[in-house]
């Protein structure tokens, strides 16, 4: 025997204990020593051997102490002695239970315990008495008498007296019973308190709760204290006590406690709404405490807490942790005597206990009391761990106990709000059972023990049970959990009343059903809205329950019965909680707090259930009825919208194969994503585990949770249902046509759909408008199991994104068969085809099978509100990090055993989803389509919603939903590799599905205005898209009616909405009868523009008007269906509409306050003028339009003025049409420009705004274009002015005024201020047809947007300084260029070489005998026949003497050399050749030393007319006369205005009278006479005579620069006066480089434009670039853009094209004297190899402006042609009526340009010229964004300036003369001159 003392000590103590001679106190002392030092087993043996003496020692000492206490009172030593005696008493009870069981010392022990239990004792003694009494009672068990049972029933004060055979009993009457007979002489001694309570003792305020806690705790702690020989009796002790407790206490604690609760056959009646109890408010520590008057409520709470303790995770404490702040928590007597068996102090005992309570047992609690923490409820001493586990095992050991526990928990759900914190603990227990550690009774019953009928009643199919059993197999219990114990012996003694049934397995489903039903009571308690604290408590508890519901939905396999119970419970809860109070003023805070979460849970559960089991139509009808009655809740609308978003994502994936988070177009738009994850709709296998997130609703937020993939076998259902569905499909095929008559009526709450109905939705008739609810017929292929996961049943990790993420605008859609007529609906073939496609898609998808739910990346599709309702922090225990942490993907399949994974080949190929009557679970095309359709209509008819705000919210969401449908449509049949175009999709979304709702909404009363506006917005969006299938006539009739009502509505907001959202695209679609709305649109746009509201859609209105300007000429009779302002009756006819339309445009071009709208109005007028000129209609308002455009040139807003300038520039190409319209109009245009420049110049010169100067430049260039286009005769015509002053009876020609204004631009506007009529003024333009002072209203100018890259920012300061410097010189520089251009090209251009050649191609090395190279080289500078000069510091002039090859150019006299002058100035490079005009004839001497004269002709100008060689000159011919005649013929611009030849005498001047003639003759005769007289008088004067000289012999000039010097002499360049303006250049290598660089620069503005042709069905670059020809209309258009030039010989701008044919043989080219445009036409370039395609793409893609001619049925996407350029795309869509719709897309930083605008519609005649002009302006707009961009002449000016500054040579006159005499002295020959 092991002990802490030596063997000898123990033996001595034993002897002394057993020595009867020793006094009892000594024996007690040695007995205590034994108890402390001997093991329990030896002690039991010792006690059983010496039980009598031991008891004697105890009893004698106890009696002695009792007497001592009565005599001496209470002191410390006696209390310690009492502790020692009671310790011995406890050991007697513990070690001798078998003897006590047979009533050993029955009366003595009973008497002793009564003394301890006496109510007069102190609390500590009473607690110790209860503990020891429970030990005794456990030992007695069934052998106890009625008295002991009654004492147990009375241990807790406050309960009613217990009825017995002696009447009502209390603890007092049982301890000291009153004598039954009054005169009896013998009666028991009165039992008095052992240790009476002292006056200062602290007493619990609620003694009922205090002693109930003591009783319950000791029932557990003492349960295993007795040392039975038969260990099984340990269980029976607790069971005996617990049975007594249930018999005597439970009826008072739970008056409504029912024994009918049975989770094995559960009663699932849905609870009813309970009224709230009356709450009593008391105050403690300045905190309100709420309680009810319900009896024993506090005790009831205590008992529920006690039960909960056994099922929550417990916190075990060591003995040292049982102190609080250094003070013992419990009475010391209990700690010492009880050997550490400390009862846990209840929360109510902390902090001094509760306040005074009345005797009605009303319970009370504070907020901290309600917020029970795990530690306060479940903290247990470590040494009691085993006994708590034993009691827990007992409570789960039989069906009776299991049912009892569940009924207690049921009662907990019925607690009032003030005690609902306890309910939350019960919820936590259920959460643990359901989601974590399943108790034994939740295991599935063994098949052999359960009849098949029971299984059917539970709603299990064979597959379900297998899944559930496989699920539960993962929850292994420790050995202590599943044990059962036999109660046979106990029952034979009558202490156990439960039926022995240890097979407690009920299965998961039963508990889920019971929990669902019972937990509803929390919601169905009327909330206490007036007490916010209680309301919050109830809300939190409800949220905790909903969290479990969510987890059940997400993670658990539930059978049909459980799903139906959940749906019914959720429906009833929703119906009860969300009913709005009748008084609208009262806010239902409870409902508001739960609304979002409750609606979300309901909807998610509904959809999830339909994926797993078949839900009846009746339930769907209930669902519809409940939700449609709650549409006044905005939260419902929000959650419905969220669910629809997720359903749409699933629909997109399962039906259309489009991932909303990974859309093809999104991928293509990201240039960085070069590696495609797959082709078509194949998903990345590596993303398998994240597929299916669209319906997750962010229920998952824990990143470390792994989730096993779930599968359900599809082989368990038979084919009869499929055959039935097929028959319905065939039957429905005949009904399609009838369905067209009721297009798009969204059935509210469509019930169960058959496959046939689903089929119909997929197919759609020719309307594609989905007349019936939708479903997919392509589910057959969806049974393929996930190939990646089928190989392994291991969980796949899921990466989650936490938080609330915004919802993207994704697309959604439903299935629509592309078809043109019902006759094409071969349903059988389509069914097979679709099934095959789906099977193929499923095999290729990784996780995108029926096992997963939705989209990839949940973060992008989540509906985060799940996470907005935070769980109670106390729920987040260490084992349960987040309540929502491991929620599975919502709407996912149930888990199955890995053995159930089957290959798709094993599945029935004709099976369909559960919702369609099949057996496939999860997402398939049919289930996705049906659920999408049903949930869409679950709110009922949305037009019946009463709240206008909610109604508007619904229609706002419908627009978002439609946008997603449209997005899906846009992403169908997209080429991902951009190498080939997919075939058109079989299924297309029904974009007109909402039409019936929208049409009805448009007719609602005005209080639903917001919803109406949203409806009109969606109608416009719906009908301005390209239609895959044209709507039928009935639909169009409804549509036109609604639009007519809207366009003619008195409500300005409706007008604004339609005009804003119905762009001109509508007119381009060409619906039958669309022109009937043209008049309505014009009127509506006019009404929008007539308002003063700047926020109105003014630009959209002007765009609509501008798009219609060509319609009146195309449609001869356009009706105006409504009377218009200024007209009393409805009007029809072309002219009336045109007149009305143009008047509106004219008005808005002058008065429109919106800048962008004003620009479009001006452009529209320009397009209309061109249209009228092209059609030769001679419309009288053309002059008005020109007047408006001309006046707009001086408008202060330079953006608008620039547009007007562009329009005037456009009209240059129509000058002949203008001249035909009115002869003076072209000249008037130039006059307007001249006068406008003169008007704006003074302010622009000194303006600090760069745009002012740039606009003057634009005007000058436009003026130049007009000058170059108009015939010289028009420019030489005198200007036309309204009032001519007498002294100026004849005005100067227009060209003179042009040069004057240019001179003013160069020299400054002050030049003409002192001279009257020096320039043309605006007043001079005034006439009956033109008002130069037409008033213009101001516009609200837009702020210029600055776009700077980060790299540019550092240089901004430098850039701005340089810009400022240049802008000062910009106007003079431009004017100089214009003058130089006019001087060189007016009347000359185009030259004989064609418009491609503007400047000379000749250089100094050509025809130079002293240079051998073909290129300009330094050798040239050493030539003795070349000298380079600078003239006026602005022009470079090269003089070159070249050998002649005979008389050229019709020169009558030849010479050995010619002179060539090469001029380089700001406007270009020019070359002139000179011949000696007059010199010695061939073979003759030169006459008398006369210097030869020169003929100078343009080098590149051919000679026309009669030519004669000098050898043909006959004797007597006047050579000079012949020369003058030849010049007049070859250069008619040299003729005088009289047009007489140069060799003809001028006409006699008129106006000389006879007297004047006579006087002149007399003067001449007098002069002659005087001369004769002088000669005669000096004839003989020798001084007057000179010696005669002989004629010198002529010498042939051989100097290499001789003739050049002669020409310089003729020009006066060698004179002293010219020295300051005429200099030499330094000849060096730098100059050579500069000259080469200068010659390489363009002398015109150049643009290169790409032209693409897109045929029908082409959506990839390879197909588009491979087109070698286009349609006839396209070819005609390209031919109209310019002239087709041969690239191998083309001398103009090439734009990078090659001459070797690698980029094509020809290209369209357009040029004026100022602009060159080359068109890179894709169909002109070869595409016979990959290299050719690459080269073609490189040329086309590098252009900034793209013209796209698209004949495809879908809109052009910029990304099809991958390029970083293409800043502007002008897309041309041919229309059915031979007009063309223009769409212009540009980068946001590109400024506005015209004349075409986005949305313009033009006729074929105008198209080429307008597109060409727009391209040029677009290219200019793009180039203006380039920092420090320079025009061609600015560039030339800078180069010239640099050359002159760096290479001009300053020298003396002598040196200069020497250089002119001999440019290269080493070559000079002496005596040559």
UniProtKB/Swiss-Prot annotation:
SUPFAM superfamilies: ARM repeat, Rap/Ran-GAP. The modification Phosphoserine is found at residues 373, 376, 379, 486, 696, 820-821, 1593. Coiled coil: none annotated. GO terms for molecular function: GTPase activator activity; protein heterodimerization activity. The modification Phosphothreonine is found at residue 715. It comes from the Eukaryota. One of its GO terms (cellular component) is nucleus. Residues 1635-1843 form the Rap-GAP domain. Residues 445-469, 801-811, 825-844 have a biased composition (Basic and acidic residues). One of its GO terms (biological process) is regulation of small GTPase mediated signal transduction. Residues 755-769, 776-799, 845-855 have a biased composition (Polar residues). Residues 341-370, 445-481, 734-856 are annotated as: Disordered. It is found in: Cytoplasm. Its main location: cytoplasm. It holds the Pfam family RALGAPB_N. Keywords: Cytoplasm, GTPase activation, Phosphoprotein. Catalytic subunit of the heterodimeric RalGAP2 complex which acts as a GTPase activator for the Ras-like small GTPases RALA and RALB. Component of the heterodimeric RalGAP2 complex with RALGAPB. Heterodimerization is required for activity. This is Ral GTPase-activating protein subunit alpha-2. It comes from Homo sapiens.
């Amino acid at each position: 025997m092991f002990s802490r003392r030596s063997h000898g000590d123990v033996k001595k103590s034993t002897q002394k204990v057993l020595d009867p001679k020793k006094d009892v106190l000594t024996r007690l002392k040695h007995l205590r020593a034994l108890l402390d030092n001997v093991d329990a087993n030896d002690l039991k043996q010792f006690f059983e051997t010496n039980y009598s003496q031991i008891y004697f020692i105890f009893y004698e000492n106890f009696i002695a102490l009792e007497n001592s206490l009565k005599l001496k009172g209470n002191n410390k030593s006696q209390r310690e002695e009492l502790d020692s005696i009671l310790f011995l008493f406890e050991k007697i009870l513990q070690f001798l239970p078998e003897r006590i069981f047979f009533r050993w010392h029955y009366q003595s022990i009973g008497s002793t315990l009564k003394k301890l239990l006496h109510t007069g004792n102190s609390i500590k003694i009473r607690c110790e008495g209860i503990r020891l009494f429970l030990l005794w009672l456990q030992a007695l068990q069934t052998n106890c008498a009625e008295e002991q049972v009654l004492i147990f029933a009375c241990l807790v004060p406050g309960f009613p007296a217990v009825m017995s055979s002696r009447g009502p009993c209390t603890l007092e009457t049982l301890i000291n019973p009153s004598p039954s007979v009054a005169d009896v002489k013998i009666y028991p001694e009165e039992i008095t308190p052992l240790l009476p309570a002292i006056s200062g003792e602290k007493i619990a305020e609620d003694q009922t709760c205090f002693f109930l806690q003591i009783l319950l705790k000791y029932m557990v702690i003492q349960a295993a204290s007795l040392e039975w020989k038969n260990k099984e009796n340990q269980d029976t002790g607790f069971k005996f006590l617990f049975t007594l407790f249930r018999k005597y206490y439970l009826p008072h604690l739970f008056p409504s406690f029912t024994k009918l609760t049975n989770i094995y056959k559960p009663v699932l009646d849905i609870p009813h709404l309970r009224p709230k109890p009356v709450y009593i408010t008391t105050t403690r520590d300045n905190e309100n405490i709420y309680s009810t008057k319900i009896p024993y409520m506090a005790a009831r709470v205590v008992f529920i807490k006690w039960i909960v303790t056994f099922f929550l995770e417990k916190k075990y404490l060591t003995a040292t942790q049982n102190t609080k702040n250094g003070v013992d928590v419990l009475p010391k007597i209990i700690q010492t005597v009880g050997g550490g068996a400390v009862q846990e102090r209840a929360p109510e005992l902390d902090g001094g206990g509760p306040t005074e309570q009345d005797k009605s047992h009303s319970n009370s609690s504070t907020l901290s009391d309600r917020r029970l923490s795990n530690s306060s409820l479940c903290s247990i001493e470590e040494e009691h761990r085993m006994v708590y586990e034993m009691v827990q095992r007992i409570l789960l050991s039989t069906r009776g106990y299991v049912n009892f526990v569940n009924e207690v928990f049921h009662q907990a759900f019925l607690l009032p709000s003030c005690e609902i914190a306890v309910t939350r603990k019960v919820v936590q227990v259920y959460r643990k059972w359901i989601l974590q550690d399943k108790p034994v009774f939740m295991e599935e019953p063994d098949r052999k023990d359960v009849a098949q009928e029971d299984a059917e009643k539970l709603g299990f199919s064979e597959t379900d049970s297998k899944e559930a059993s496989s699920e539960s197999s993962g929850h292994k219990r420790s050995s202590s959990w599943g044990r059962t114990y036999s109660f046979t012996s106990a029952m034979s003694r009558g202490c156990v009343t439960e039926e022995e049934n240890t097979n407690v397995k009920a299965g998961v489903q039963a508990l889920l059903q019971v929990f669902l039903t019972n937990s509803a009571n929390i919601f169905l308690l009327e909330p206490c809205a007036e007490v916010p604290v209680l309301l919050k408590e109830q809300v939190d508890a409800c949220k905790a329950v909903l969290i479990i519901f969510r987890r059940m939905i997400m993670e658990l396999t539930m059978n049909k019965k459980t799903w139906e119970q959940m749906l019914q419970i959720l429906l009833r809860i929703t119906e009860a909680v969300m009913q709005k109070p009748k008084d609208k003023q009262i806010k239902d805070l409870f409902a508001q707090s739960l609304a979002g979460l409750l609606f979300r849970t309901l909807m998610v559960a509904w959809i999830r259930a339909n994926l797993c089991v078949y839900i009846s139509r009746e339930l769907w009808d209930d669902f519809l009825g409940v939700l449609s009655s709650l549409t006044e809740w905005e939260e419902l609308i929000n959650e419905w919208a969220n669910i629809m978003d997720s359903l749409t994502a699933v629909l997109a994936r399962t039906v259309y194969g489009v991932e909303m988070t990974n859309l093809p177009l999104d991928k293509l738009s990201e240039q960085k994503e070069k590696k495609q994850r797959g082709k078509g709709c194949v998903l990345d296998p590596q993303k398998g585990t994240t597929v299916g997130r669209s319906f997750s609703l962010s229920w998952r937020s824990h990143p470390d949770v792994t989730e096993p993939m779930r599968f359900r076998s599809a082989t368990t259902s038979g084919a009869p249902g499929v055959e039935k569905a097929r028959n319905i499909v065939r039957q429905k095929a005949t009904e399609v046509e009838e369905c067209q008559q009721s297009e798009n009526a969204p059935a509210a709450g469509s019930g169960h759909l058959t496959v046939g109905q689903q089929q119909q939705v997929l197919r759609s008739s020719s309307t594609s408008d989905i007349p019936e609810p939708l479903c997919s017929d392509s589910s057959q292929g969806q049974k393929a199991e996930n190939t990646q996961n089928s190989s392994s049943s291991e969980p796949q990790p899921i990466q989650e994104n936490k938080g609330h993420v915004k919802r993207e605008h994704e697309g959604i859609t439903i299935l629509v068969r592309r078809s043109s007529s019902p006759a094409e609906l071969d349903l059988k073939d389509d069914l097979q085809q679709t099934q095959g496609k789906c099977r193929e898609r499923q095999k290729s998808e990784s996780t995108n099978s029926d096992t997963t739910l939705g989209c990839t990346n949940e973060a992008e599709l989540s509906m985060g509100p799940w996470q907005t309702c935070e769980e109670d922090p106390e729920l987040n225990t260490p084992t349960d990090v987040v309540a929502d942490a491991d929620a599975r993907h919502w709407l996912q399949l149930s888990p199955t055993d890995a053995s159930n994974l089957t290959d798709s080949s094993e599945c029935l190929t004709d099976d369909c989803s559960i919702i369609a009557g099949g057996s496939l679970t999860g997402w398939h095309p049919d289930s996705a389509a049906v659920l999408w359709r049903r949930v869409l209509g679950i709110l009922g008819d949305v037009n019946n919603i009463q709240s206008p705000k909610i109604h508007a919210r619904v229609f706002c969401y419908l627009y978002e939903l439609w946008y997603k449908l449209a997005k899906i449509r846009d992403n169908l049949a997209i080429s991902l590799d951009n190498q080939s175009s997919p075939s058109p999709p079989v299924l297309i979304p029904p974009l007109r599905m909402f039409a019936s709702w929208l049409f009805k909404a448009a007719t609602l009363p005005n209080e639903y205005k917001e919803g109406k506006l949203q409806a009109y917005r969606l109608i416009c969006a719906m009908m301005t898209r390209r239609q895959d299938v044209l709507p039928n006539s009935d639909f169009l009739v409804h549509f036109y009616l609604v639009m007519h009502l809207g366009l003619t509505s008195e409500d300005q907001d409706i007008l604004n909405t339609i005009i804003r959202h119905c762009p001109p695209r509508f007119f381009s679609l060409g619906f039958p009868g669309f022109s009937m709305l043209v008049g309505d649109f014009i009127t509506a746009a006019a009404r929008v523009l007539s308002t003063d509201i700047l926020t109105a859609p003014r630009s959209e209105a002007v765009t609509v008007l501008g798009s219609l300007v060509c319609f009146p000429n195309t449609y001869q009779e356009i009706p105006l269906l409504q009377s218009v302002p200024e007209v009393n009756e409805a009007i029809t006819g072309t002219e009336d509409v045109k007149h009305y339309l143009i008047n509106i445009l004219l008005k808005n071009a002058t008065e429109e306050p919106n800048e962008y709208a004003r620009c479009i109005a001006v452009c529209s007028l320009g397009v209309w003028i061109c249209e009228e000129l092209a059609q030769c209609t001679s419309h009288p308002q053309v002059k008005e339009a020109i007047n408006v455009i001309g006046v707009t040139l001086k408008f202060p807003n330079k953006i608008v003025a620039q547009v007007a300038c562009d329009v005037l520039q456009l009209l240059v190409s129509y000058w002949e049409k203008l001249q035909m319209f009115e002869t003076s109009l072209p000249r008037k245009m130039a006059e307007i420009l001249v006068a406008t420049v003169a008007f704006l110049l003074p302010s622009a010169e000194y303006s600090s705004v760069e745009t002012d100067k740039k606009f003057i430049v634009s005007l000058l260039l436009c003026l130049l274009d007009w000058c170059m286009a108009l015939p010289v005769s028009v420019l030489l015509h005198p200007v036309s002015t309204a009032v001519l002053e007498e002294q100026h009876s004849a005005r100067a020609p227009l060209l003179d005024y042009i040069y004057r204004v240019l001179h003013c631009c160069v020299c400054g506007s002050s030049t003409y201020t002192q001279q009257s009529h020096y320039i043309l003024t605006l007043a001079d333009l005034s006439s009956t047809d033109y008002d130069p002072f037409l008033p213009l209203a101001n516009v609200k100018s837009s702020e210029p947007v600055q776009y700077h890259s980060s790299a540019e920012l550092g240089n901004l300061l430098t850039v701005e300084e340089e810009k400022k410097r240049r802008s000062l010189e910009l106007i003079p520089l431009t004017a100089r260029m214009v003058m130089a251009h006019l001087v060189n090209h007016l009347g000359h251009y185009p030259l004989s070489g064609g418009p491609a050649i503007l400047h000379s191609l000749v250089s100094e090395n050509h025809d130079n005998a002293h240079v051998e190279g073909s290129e300009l080289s330094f050798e040239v500078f050493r030539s003795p026949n070349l000298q380079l000069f600078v003239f006026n510091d602005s022009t470079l002039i090269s003089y070159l003497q070249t050998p002649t090859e005979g008389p050229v150019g019709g020169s009558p006299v030849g010479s050995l050399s010619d002179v060539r002058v090469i001029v380089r100035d700001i406007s270009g490079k020019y070359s002139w050749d000179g011949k000696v005009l007059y010199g010695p004839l061939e073979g003759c001497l030169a006459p008398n030393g006369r210097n030869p004269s020169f003929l100078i002709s343009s080098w590149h100008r051919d000679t026309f007319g009669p030519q004669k060689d000098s050898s043909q000159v006959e004797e007597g011919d006047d050579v000079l006369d012949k020369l003058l005649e030849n010049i007049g013929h070859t250069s008619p611009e040299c003729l005088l205005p009289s047009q007489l030849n140069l060799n003809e005498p001028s006409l006699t001047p008129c106006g000389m009278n006879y007297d004047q003639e006579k006087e002149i003759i007399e003067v001449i005769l007098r002069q002659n006479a005087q001369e004769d007289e002088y000669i005669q008088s000096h004839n003989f004067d020798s001084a007057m005579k000179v010696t005669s000289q002989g004629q010198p012999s002529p010498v042939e000039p051989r100097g290499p620069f001789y003739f050049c010097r002669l020409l310089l002499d003729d020009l006066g360049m060698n004179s002293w006066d010219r020295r300051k303006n005429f200099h030499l250049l330094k000849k060096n290598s730098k100059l050579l480089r500069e000259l080469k660089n200068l010659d390489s620069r363009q002398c015109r503005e150049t643009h290169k434009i790409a032209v693409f042709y897109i045929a029908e069905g082409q959506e990839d670059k390879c197909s588009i670039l491979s087109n070698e020809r286009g349609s006839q209309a396209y070819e005609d258009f390209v031919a109209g853009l310019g002239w087709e030039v041969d690239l191998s010989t083309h001398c103009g701008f090439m734009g990078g094209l090659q001459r070797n044919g690698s980029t094509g043989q020809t290209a369209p080219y357009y040029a004026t004297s100022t602009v060159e445009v080359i068109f890179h036409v894709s169909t002109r370039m070869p595409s016979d190899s990959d290299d050719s395609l690459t080269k073609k793409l490189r040329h086309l893609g590098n252009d900034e402006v793209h013209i796209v001619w698209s004949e495809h049925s879908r809109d052009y996407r910029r990304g099809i042609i991958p390029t970083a350029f293409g800043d502007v795309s002008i897309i041309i869509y041919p229309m059915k009526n031979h007009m063309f719709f223009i769409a212009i897309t540009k980068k946001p930083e590109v400024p506005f340009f015209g004349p075409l605008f986005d949305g313009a519609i033009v006729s074929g005649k105008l198209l080429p010229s307008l597109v060409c002009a727009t391209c040029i302006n677009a290219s200019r707009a793009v180039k203006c964004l380039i920092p420090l961009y320079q025009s061609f002449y600015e560039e030339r000016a800078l180069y010239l300036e640099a050359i002159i500054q760096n290479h001009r040579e300053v020298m003396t006159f002598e040196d200069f003369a020497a250089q002119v005499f001999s440019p290269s002295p080493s070559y000079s020959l002496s005596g040559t001159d």
